[in-house]
Amino acid sequence: MNQTLLSEFGNPAERVERALDALRHGRGVLVLDDEDRENEGDMIFSAENMTVEQMALTIRHGSGIVCLCLTEERRQQLELPMMVEKNSSHYQTAFTVTIEAAEGVTTGVSAADRLTTIRAAIADNAKPSDLNRPGHVFPLRAQPGGVLTRGGHTEATVDLMTLAGLKPSGVLCELTNDDGSMAHAPEVIAFAKQHDMPVLTIEDLVAYRVAAERKAS
């Protein structure tokens, strides 16, 4: 990632700290992956703090595929089978079956309905019967070890929530341009400025975690 583009958001460690602070205060962040990977920016919000307005923003400016990033423990708690037995996707994106809240939604498509589904899935006492399958929210299972195991947006989302002291569940959606094409670094940065959202990279987060673990040892 071209660090010059991101320099106005601080150095790598500062970018992570600003993102964590934003998440603690209920704001969203934008996460870029490597230019030689997907080279995309995702809008990411804390699942427990996300508002209907933020969900509407996500649907309006995103790909429409609103994903809920979960730990393996939560996936098992909800008894969500993986979408396929053999994952042949290029980046091994770990989708489970899609979900809908069993109560409190109509068609499940609206911003409010999708948020109701997410809140049902992350509730402390959530059980499998709280969710219908299929639905309009796409759960993703994060790899244990986070970005140190897999450098994906799913793992970055769960890592950010954990580091921020929040529930280890987050909502992500790929940012798109008005013409439907995927947003890359310049467009992501412009969107971030317009909506007062911090920007960081998965590379930043990897370095931050490595430094923290080295310091702890």
Curated annotation (Swiss-Prot):
Q: Which UniProt keywords apply?
A: Lyase, Magnesium, Manganese, Metal-binding, Riboflavin biosynthesis
Q: Which residues bind D-ribulose 5-phosphate?
A: R37, E38, D42, R150, G151, G152, H153, T154, E174
UniProt GO molecular function: 3,4-dihydroxy-2-butanone-4-phosphate synthase activity; magnesium ion binding; manganese ion binding
Q: Which reaction does it catalyse?
A: D-ribulose 5-phosphate = (2S)-2-hydroxy-3-oxobutyl phosphate + formate + H(+)
- Per its UniProt record, what InterPro entries does this chain match? DHBP_synth_RibB-like_a/b_dom, DHBP_synthase_RibB
| Biological process terms in GO annotation | riboflavin biosynthetic process
Q: Which GO terms describe its cellular component?
A: cytosol
Cofactor: record remark: Binds 2 divalent metal cations per subunit. Magnesium or manganese.
Q: Which Enzyme Commission numbers does its entry carry? A: 4.1.99.12
Q: Name one Pfam family in it.
A: DHBP_synthase
Which cofactor does this sequence's record say it needs? Mg(2+); Mn(2+)
Q: Which residues participate in Mg(2+) 1 binding?
A: E38
The UniProt site entry described as Essential for catalytic activity is assigned to H136, E174
Q: Where does Mg(2+) 2 bind?
A: E38, H153
Pathway the protein takes part in: Cofactor biosynthesis; riboflavin biosynthesis; 2-hydroxy-3-oxobutyl phosphate from D-ribulose 5-phosphate: step 1/1
What domain of life? Bacteria
Q: What does this protein do?
A: Catalyzes the conversion of D-ribulose 5-phosphate to formate and 3,4-dihydroxy-2-butanone 4-phosphate.
Return the NCBIfam families for the record: ribB
PANTHER family this protein is in?
3,4-DIHYDROXY-2-BUTANONE 4-PHOSPHATE SYNTHASE, GTP CYCLOHYDROLASE II-RELATED
Spell out the subunit comment.
Homodimer.
Q: What is this protein called?
A: 3,4-dihydroxy-2-butanone 4-phosphate synthase
Protein source organism: Pectobacterium carotovorum subsp. carotovorum (strain PC1)
